[in-house]
Regions:
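Membrane-proximal intracellular helices of multi-pass ion channels
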Residues: 1-157
């Protein structure tokens, strides 16, 4: 139970502008406020009588998606490579992505392949998920300038 709570806190991390890792408290706040605005039936994400830009909302969801995918992929890789339990593997991976430095005792006994997975996740966590996503997406940006595709409304939920 305490490891799960620690994983949640490590994944969220600290506030922006500091040295803490994780997806940042403001990202979680924007995600929560966006869900709240959907439940209220309002179109805009609002906080303290201010409207959040749509770009911030998209970035927050992108950060969550990239970081969540990294955690899930890293956990699966550690499970396959190390033949360990789910909780210790998940704890190590979240600690690496959040650049926390805590361990459930698994790090010293990892194979070279497992250590490489953790190293890649640490670098990814240090650079932040959105920086990495923007780095890889920047080369596709020039092709979409000046054009808008038709809108398609789909049922969600």
């Amino acid at each position: 139970q305490s490891q799960l709570l620690s994983c949640i806190l490590m994944f969220i991390g600290g506030s922006p502008g500091g040295t803490a890792g994780g997806i940042k408290t403001t990202t979680i706040a924007i995600l929560y406020l966006t869900c709240w605005s959907v439940l209220k039936g309002t179109e805009d994400t609002e906080c303290f009588r201010r409207r959040m830009p749509a770009a911030n909302v998209r970035t927050a969801f992108s950060v969550l998606t990239v970081a969540g995918t990294a955690v899930l992929t890293g956990t699966m890789l550690i499970l396959v490579l190390e033949h360990t339990g789910l909780i210790p593997a998940f704890y190590e991976v979240v600690s690496a992505v959040g650049t926390v430095g805590l361990t459930a005792g698994l790090t010293p006994v990892l194979t070279t392949a497992g250590k490489l997975v953790i190293i890649v996740l640490m670098y990814m966590g240090r650079l932040s998920p959105v920086t990495l996503a923007l780095l890889f997406a920047s080369r596709y940006k020039k092709y979409g300038k000046g054009r808008k595709l038709p809108e398609e409304r789909i049922m969600v939920g």
